């Protein structure tokens, strides 16, 4: 989910950093 995390990183912000 690293690539998906990058897209969500824009939406969720810091939460996306935890995904990536």
Swiss-Prot record:
Keyword Acetylation attached: no
Annotated region (Disordered), positions in chain: 1-20
Keyword Metal-binding appears in the UniProt entry: no
Tree of life domain: Eukaryota
TM stretches of this protein: none
Key words of the record: IgA-binding protein, Lectin
Polar residues composition-biased segments: 1-11
A molecular function (GO) term: IgA binding
Oligomer status and interactors: Tetramer of four alpha chains associated with two or four beta chains.
Family that this chain belongs to: Belongs to the jacalin lectin family.
Role: D-galactose-specific lectin, binds the T-antigen structure Gal-beta1,3-GalNAc (Thomsen-Friedenreich-antigen-specific lectin). Potent and selective stimulant of distinct T- and B-cell functions. Shows a unique ability to specifically recognize IgA-1 from human serum.
Protein name: Agglutinin beta-1 chain
Record organism: Artocarpus tonkinensis
């Amino acid at each position: 989910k690293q690539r998906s995390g990058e897209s969500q990183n824009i939406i969720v912000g810091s939460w996306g950093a935890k995904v990536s």
